[in-house]
């Protein structure tokens, strides 16, 4: 398995994986991925099995500690010098789930955020996934009123303080 950042040629594969992982109402389009990769391809963590994209994690950087719906749709909000790494999606093809691949990418995103001196990482998820992200040091901040994207309920936050408690 190879982990790397995204380039424009990855957009069709990103779109295909996203379409397998999320319902149409929640999935980002190829056009949205093209815009995201153009603005922050170095904040996409991709795992390839040979030449096949099997899993990816992505999100931009901002000074805002709250993940909002507008962020999903507006890649120009990315601020490379921002304090917080947002996580917009964690995607793994169904045939490759339960092998720890997404976890490896989450850990890489955390390591990169630490290396870049970010305050932490922010993601939203459905209730049933809170325990999964807790394994990586994310703390449940409760129900969010900042985002309804994908009918999420919980906002999770990872800070360097969380790493000290692991």
Role assignments for model-derived ranges:
Residues 55-90, 97, 107, 146-154:
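Conserved acyl-donor/pantetheine-binding loop and adjacent beta-alpha core of acyl/acetyltransferases
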Residues 93, 126:
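Residue-level recognition of the GNAT/N-acetyltransferase active site
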Residues 98-106, 113:
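Glycine-rich acyl-CoA binding loop
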């Amino acid at each position: 398995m190879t982990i790397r950042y995204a380039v424009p040629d990855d957009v069709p594969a990103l779109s295909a994986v996203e379409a397998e992982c999320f319902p149409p109402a929640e999935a980002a389009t190829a056009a949205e991925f093209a815009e995201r990769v153009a603005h922050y391809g170095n904040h996409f963590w991709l795992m390839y099995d040979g030449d096949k994209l099997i899993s990816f994690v992505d999100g931009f950087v901002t000074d805002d500690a709250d993940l909002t719906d507008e962020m999903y749709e507006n890649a120009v909000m990315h601020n490379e010098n921002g304090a917080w790494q947002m996580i917009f999606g964690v995607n793994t093809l169904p045939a490759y789930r339960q092998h720890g691949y997404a976890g490896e990418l989450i850990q890489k995103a955390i390591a990169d955020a630490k290396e870049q001196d970010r305050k932490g990482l922010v993601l939203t998820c459905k209730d049933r996934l809170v325990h999964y992200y807790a394994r990586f040091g994310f703390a449940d901040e409760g129900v969010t009123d900042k985002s309804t994207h994908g009918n999420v309920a919980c906002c999770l936050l990872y800070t360097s303080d969380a790493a000290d408690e692991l």
